[in-house]
Amino acid sequence: ESRRGGGGPAAAAAAAGDPRGPMPGFGAPQHTIPTNVNVMQPSRVADLGALAHSAGFRIEDLANFSTNNLFNLKPNTHAYTSDPLQFGNYGKSISPTDLATTAAAAAAVTAVDPQALLQQKGVQPNLVALRTHNNDNWGESSMADTSPRTDTSTDPDIDIDERNQMFEQGQLAAPTASDSSDKSRDKLDHKSLRRLAQNREAARKSRLRKKAYIQNLESSRLKLTQLEQELQRARQQGIFISSSGDQSQSASGNGAVAFDMEYARWLEEHNKHINELRAAANAHAGDDDLRKIVDSIMSQYDEFFRLKGVAAKADVFHVLSGMWKTPAERCFMWLGGFRSSELLKLLAGQLEPLTEQQLTGICNLQQSSQQAEDALSQGMEALQQSLAETLASGSLGPAGSSGNVASYMGQMAMAMGKLGTLENFLRQADNLRLQTLQQMQRILTTRQSARALLAISDYFSRLRALSSLWLARPRE
């Protein structure tokens, strides 16, 4: 009984006999809180007072907790161990006056109305909420408050509800600061990612612009070659560059249209042989290989002049006017083709070095070609003059008379006879061109002949490209 601090007879007698009062027990007295806390045992008033004093609670607070039936404690009792260190002085005696005062305070506790205490302290009796949050944790909270190592406030003006509210606010403040920091970091990360994305997009657009610029340069460099190829494909389809009047004349006869188609096919084959000859010359092929290619190209020229003869019989004006050629080629045409003498002048600088014998042969060939061209030119002038005189002569009598009709028919018959000689002039001019090429091949070596044929092909190819560029020029 003395270890538990009880109030038995032996303890009372000891307290009465000893003037210093009873000695406090050094053991840890066990204070058992019964299930029904409204019943207070008088024998343990002193222990209850010591417990209330050590926990730092006011008497009315303890009464508030002990008398309120909303704290439905669990049936099992919780043992609270009183730490002897919470007594300031072990030698201090407890007087009977203190015991009486404590007993009176405990009796007053049992008479206090718990609802009135709650209203005085401004606490709303939200019984359901308190039971929900604090019913199960009441034992742990009481143990924490009675522990001497718990940092609790000793200010009597601050009750448990206020401390709980301050604790909850402290717990909520930390996540709020953490959330604010996380949001700030997320915002900075978002800005950095957006800036990086903008930089990548700008770099990608710059690369695309540079790539497009390089492609435009390459396409411009190859434009002349592409125009020539497009012209060749157009000729394969029978589409040729000409004015509307010339085009109508070209389509007037089946012979002219057939010749245009044959010429397009011949030009395609000719370009293939020229490319083959160029590749062989660049590869430094032997004379035998070059001779085979040169002979095939000369055979192509022979075939071309044969096709022109057939077309001249069908429509001599179509062949003579050069409607199957481009406008730039027609500008340099002479009797339906090129001038042999002018071509030899262009080749003189491409065939060097020449031996003395070769130079003499080229000069003689050029002079003979020039003389033949002059003779044919004079013949054409004479024919044109005679044809003009025939058409201009005639009677000036009244129209519709029998004499005028007969004169008209006579003039047309004479003009038709003279026009028949145009085919002869065209054939002689083509023979001169073919003979000039064949004679040049005999004067030059195989490798020189290959260079000459390549130079001729390049010359006419540039004329065709010039014509295409001229027609494609912007017009104001």
Curated annotation (Swiss-Prot):
Region (Basic motif): 191-211
Keyword DNA-binding: yes
InterPro entries noted in UniProt: bZIP, bZIP_sf, TGA_domain
This protein's GO CC annotations: nucleus
Cited PROSITE patterns: BZIP, BZIP_BASIC, DOG1
Domain bZIP, first and last residues per copy: 189-252
Sequence segments annotated as region (Disordered): 1-29, 133-159, 171-207
Region (Leucine-zipper): 217-231
GO BP terms in the entry: DNA-templated transcription
Location within or outside the cell: Nucleus
Start-end of Polar residues biased regions: 135-144
Positions with biased composition (Low complexity): 10-25
Biased composition range(s): Basic and acidic residues: 180-191
GO molecular function, one term: sequence-specific DNA binding
The DOG1 domain, residue ranges: 256-473
This protein's UniProt keywords: Activator, Coiled coil, DNA-binding, Nucleus, Transcription, Transcription regulation
Coiled-coil region: 201-242
Entry keyword annotation includes DNA-binding: yes
Quaternary state and interactors: Binds DNA as a dimer.
Family from the record: Belongs to the bZIP family.
Function in brief: Transcriptional activator that binds specifically to the DNA sequence 5'-TGACG-3'. Recognizes ocs elements like the as-1 motif of the cauliflower mosaic virus 35S promoter. Binding to the as-1-like cis elements mediate auxin- and salicylic acid-inducible transcription. Binds to the hexamer motif 5'-ACGTCA-3' of histone gene promoters.
Official protein name in the record: Transcription factor HBP-1b(c1)
